[in-house]
Every structure is written in structure tokens, then in C-alpha cells.
């Protein structure tokens, strides 16, 4: 598959495996640690997800502020998929020190599309969004793709 053609002329997205899963797991563990909402004995993403589902907006905001100290998140994400990033962007990159992070929590006031809004915001024709869940996806209820051609008709 020609990745660039698929993104620009095809469906508008591509599913790609994480190349360095060990580093990606370290990224996930660092994320959990920086959120600072689980106990020392239960520092895992599933505990964080359960706790966050019951948190108020103010509590979630405090946890998001804690993430501001995670200044190497972008680097870790890039190094988790180095050949993908190099294929799309080349070797010289301009990256954000603090990665853009959105937390999806249950409830009517939270849109399921919110975590994916940056894909359609028109940031730049030269911007690519790397999206990777920090938890296992057990079914297709939490992840879905909208074909680029179909989305243009909406």
C-alpha cells in the first residue's frame, strides 16, 4: 500500500501497527504515572479508565494539567512508529513539546467524536495525526473510521 496515496486520495486514514511496542508500553505507563490518579500498587491504564469515568470535569482538568509535565510524549510516540513517521514526514521534524491529548469519558455531555476532531480541523495539509489507544480495544464500539469520500458528503 502506498501510504501517502491512501491518506490523500484513498480513505483518508490508514491503520498501521506500532513498531516498537516496548516503547509504546513505556509511553502508556508514563502517561498513567503523570495522570497521578491511581495508587502505587494499581498503576495501570484500566484502573485509570475506571477512576476517570467517575471523575468530575474539574478533577479531569486537574489530571490534564498534570500531563503538562509529560514533555517527551511526542518523542516517544514518534519513536514508537519511526518508519511510519519517516515515510510520511521525512527525517527532519518539527514536533510539539507537549502532545495534544484529549480524554474520552462516558456520558451524554461527551461526544464520541471529540477525540478525533483534529483529523478534520484542517490544521495544515502537511499535518498527520497519529492516534493510538492506550488501552486494549476489545470490540469495535470505541473505534471507528469515517471514509474520507463519505465524510465529504456529510
How does the language model describe each region?
Residues 109-154:
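Catalytic core of non-heme Fe(II) oxygenases with the double-stranded beta-helix
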Residues 1-11, 16-115, 121:
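Non-heme Fe(II)-dependent double-stranded beta-helix
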